[in-house]
A protein has these predicted regions:
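Helix-turn-helix-type domain boundary/helix-start signal
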Residues: 24-25, 97, 129
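Flexible loop/turn segments at secondary-structure boundaries
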Residues: 61-63, 91-92, 106, 128-129, ...
């Protein structure tokens, strides 16, 4: 009645584990040109441009950016901060993102498009919904980076720069 052995035992020798593919990322040397193209883009919603710049400055995951809510931000203080709730984080722990003055400036600009409540980066046509998962990727592709860069790849770019600087411990960088 009960199975004595494991019928799948030994299958790991037959099937190989798929290799994980890293996200395409721009070399840091190309980032200034990319940002210039973002700034010069035409026919793109201003909120999309601001979201791209904010994502580059904070190097958060796309989902964290898309679902960012105004109540998570404290920007009117000496040390502006974004506190991302654990339920939205990959590791399930609350995450604190210090904000540069440039990031704060982007948030201040975004208020004219999204208002002071709800999603910081909402859909243009339906502000009660977050920005589409593909908005920033399509924007990057439109700038001529299709296949060369993924939005998640910016995290790789920043991680490489920070690790090569040797100013921070690799474990601390990985936590960001």
């Amino acid at each position: 009645e009960h199975c004595i052995g494991n019928p799948s035992q030994g299958l790991q020798r037959i099937f190989t584990k798929p290799k994980s593919k890293s996200h395409n990322s721009l070399p840091i040397s190309e980032l200034p040109k990319f940002i210039s193209k973002v700034d010069a883009s035409e026919g793109v919603y201003p909120s999309t441009v601001l979201a791209m710049k904010f994502m580059i400055l904070t190097f958060v995951r796309t989902g964290e950016l898309r679902f960012a809510d105004w109540k998570e931000f404290d920007i009117n203080c000496a040390e502006p901060l974004w506190v991302i709730p654990g339920e939205r984080m990959k590791m399930g722990k609350t995450h604190h993102v210090p904000l540069s003055r440039q990031a704060v400036s982007i948030l201040e600009d975004m208020q004219q498009y999204s208002g002071p409540k709800g999603y910081v980066f909402p859909q243009v046509r339906n502000p009660k919904k977050p920005m589409s998962n593909n908005t920033l990727l399509y924007f990057s592709n439109r700038l001529g980076y299709a296949g060369r860069n993924t939005i998640h790849g910016f995290r790789s770019t920043v991680s490489t720069v920070l690790n090569e600087s040797r100013k921070w411990h690799p474990d601390v960088i990985e936590l960001q």
